[in-house]
Amino acid sequence: MKPSTEWWRYLAPLAVIAIIALIPVPAGLESHTWLYFAVFTGVIVGLILEPVPGAVVAMVGISIIAILSPWLLFSPEQLAQPGFKFTAKSLSWAVSGFSNSVIWLIFAAFMFGTGYEKTGLGRRIALILVKKMGHRTLFLGYAVMFSELILAPVTPSNSARGAGIIYPIIRNLPPLYQSQPNDSSSRSIGSYIMWMGIVADCVTSAIFLTAMAPNLLLIGLMKSASHATLSWGDWFLGMLPLSILLVLLVPWLAYVLYPPVLKSGDQVPRWAETELQAMGPLCSREKRMLGLMVGALVLWIFGGDYIDAAMVGYSVVALMLLLRIISWDDIVSNKAAWNVFFWLASLITLATGLNNTGFISWFGKLLAGSLSGYSPTIVMVALIVVFYLLRYFFASATAYTSALAPMMIAAALAMPEIPLPVFCLMVGAAIGLGSILTPYATGPSPIYYGSGYLPTVDYWRLGAIFGLIFLVLLVITGLLWMPVVLL
């Protein structure tokens, strides 16, 4: 697209800010709160349209609010307090997101992913599973799922995991059986494998807190609005029954609903064996990497009472540097990690301001009045269903989470009977699982969609079927299991 045709992407966020700012301030809100909300909404529109990278959009929004803080961030009462310096306070607010533990946890997880990539351990694990399980097409589907499952806890970019590690491996498999893209032979085995690639990425993105950046964004938003949080272990245990069910069910379900013509063969295991021989035996760097990852997972699951999850990640990254698994240049040059670091920290800062100015509490009271008289369970399920279905309207999981999660959290806070940890975990799971609905929902989606093995009609049909199954199972386990371990 030519720059001259993109002007509207720049003007739309500004127009939204202006329109909201000109609307009379609603009853119960102060003027600075309403103006803050106007800028916040403009940032969300900017994240959706992306005239510039998302991190830049968020930083511009923070800059506007901080510079105009006497009118957008602070109340007249605050400004009138003796010794109150809005310049220092606004700067402190602007950079507050960078001290959030969630930010450093996801940054550490990105470095773990770099270690997997540099040592070749991630590729080796996937090839071993393909070699051992690739004799039957159904088992090959499980190999794809297990590969994603092993990589997910330490790869917070589902795009890097799905499109960067798994896809480059599995795209080599269909041609071994003369299953070609954009051809009638694609259904031989290629279509099943490619569908398993994207559906496994979506499932594993929901299983672990550190499997997808928006999961951590949600926790940051939750903490800024309520001071409550979910640890890595809370997320893992809360998702455990649903995780086991989906990991075991999905490959078989895909096999039944989108059956491959070819049921078995030896070409894939032989190819994987050749690739493994080319890699050579497990080297010392891979062994060190494996040991550190196992240690990190153990501490994340069982060490919550003794050490913060972010501190675990921070310490493991330091050990990775000392053990020469990664270099300092790897950290400095990791554009993806720094990109997420900046936009996630900036969005958490903006969400904190939304709460500090009183908008969240006002919106919660507004919802409380409209939701009164309904069962908390019915309200919770209805909110999850609405949140899930709105995924159709977003091409970015980050924009989706940034736009809707604060409203979902405010709605839950409006009804004290709704258990916030359970509700937020259901919202978090919906972010990952709902990514299966469309071929544009998350980073790897267009990669698999564009592989030539997944026709448009098939993708939308399977997305709707699997999406519905995921939603039903999420609601059931959310109501029956999550309260047992989270409350």
Swiss-Prot record:
Pfam families: Na_sulph_symp. InterPro entries: CitT-rel, SLC13A/DASS. It comes from Escherichia coli O6:K15:H31 (strain 536 / UPEC). Catalyzes the uptake of tartrate in exchange for intracellular succinate. Essential for anaerobic L-tartrate fermentation. This is L-tartrate/succinate antiporter. Its main location: membrane. The keyword Membrane applies. Keywords: Antiport, Cell inner membrane, Cell membrane, Membrane, Transmembrane, Transmembrane helix, Transport. GO terms for cellular component: plasma membrane. It catalyses: (2R,3R)-tartrate(out) + succinate(in) = (2R,3R)-tartrate(in) + succinate(out). It is found in: Cell inner membrane. Disulfide bonds: none annotated. It is a multi-pass membrane protein. The chain crosses the membrane at residues 10-30, 33-53, 54-74, 93-113, 137-157, 189-209, 236-256, 292-312, 313-333, 340-360, 370-390, 393-413, 418-438, 465-485. Belongs to the SLC13A/DASS transporter (TC 2.A.47) family. DIT1 subfamily. GO terms for molecular function: antiporter activity.
